[in-house]
Amino acid sequence: MIKYSLSTMALCAAFTSSAADLELLHSFESEVYTEAQPVKSFLDEFNHPLTSGDSAFTYNIFELGVKYKGFSLGAQSRYNYVLEFDPDTALFTYLEKNDLSFEKRNYRYLLKGKQSTTHGVFLAYDIEALGNGITITPKVTYYQSAHFQDAVVDGNVFSDEIKGQLQTEYYFSRDILFKSFTPTERPDGKGYSFDLEVKWQVNDDLKLSIRAKDLINETKYDGVGFVNGFTTEVPFTEQGDSIVTEPSVRFQTSAFGGEIEYSFEHDARYYFDISYRYNDQFSFDVFTRKYNSDTFIQSNVHYHFSDNWSIFSGYETHSKAVELGITNKYFGVSVKTDKLDLDDAYYAKINWYFKFAF
């Protein structure tokens, strides 16, 4: 009887110890940024006064999982969209959409777009390195995907006339450009991504962090639709020896069951963060992130009104956005935008997280 009681106590102690190391994790982050037009106008009429710019993006991620003794495992859903364009392309679109006068010249027309939706599982592990406050966290996500777009349109268009030279490389699960070559069955995509984070707790007050998201990101699709080819102006001589041109169009497409296999990739994003605890009431952050050609730098001020809780505010360059948030060890939420009237905003972000220890 005594032996049984001791065994039961040992099992209970082991379970209690294990449960204490187990955490439920959840996070959600959604951000959108556009140049040349506010977000609403960019997606709709393109009728806001034109500003300079050459990029737009939205990154959205939902995660739910558990963490145990440094291992994190869970489910993930993502929607990413990245667009690069020439400022001349934005001007051409603005003039066309609003029935304004064109100059008699060639307009540079360049669009590079990538879009994907994925659902999968992730695994991460915190590696305590060298006992010097350094933690290295590799993270691998395996996912499936049935929706993506990968497009490049490059060339020039003369004024508002149907003249010019354009090269097109377009791969898709659904044809949103030509609206004629959507595969009868959705493509089947499987892929993976690799993220890496290094944290260094320099001392009790100073912490540094370097992150690379989508350091590797590759998806292989089967049954992909495509449109590849070019338009150009072909000169010929009319009677009287005058030279005129007419447009020529040459495209290869996936029509009539010509779908193919395709490998799709997203570009990496890089982050460098510095956090400093000034005293019991105040701490400061400097966050730097680079997305393709865009670099954002943000500074935050935290006010700690208890041992666990703080409120913070920050300003970010490039997006010119202000962030407000509240956070503690187990919960946090923040919003960030450059305009209170979201109809006029070029940037908007919301994110939250919580951790629940058993």
For each feature predicted by the language model, list its residue ranges.
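Transmembrane beta-strands of outer-membrane beta-barrel proteins
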Residues: 20-26, 69-75, 132-140, 194, ...
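Sec-dependent signal peptide recognition
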Residues: 2-8
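N-terminal signal peptide c-region/cleavage motif recognized by signal peptidases
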Residues: 14-17
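Loop-centered beta-sheet repeat module
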Residues: 157-228
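Outer membrane beta-barrel transmembrane domains
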Residues: 223-358
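A subset of solvent-exposed loop/turn segments in beta-rich extracellular surface proteins, enriched
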Residues: 21-184, 228-248, 336, 340-358
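Surface-exposed extracellular loop regions of Gram-negative outer-membrane beta-barrel proteins
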Residues: 91-96, 121, 191-193, 275, ...
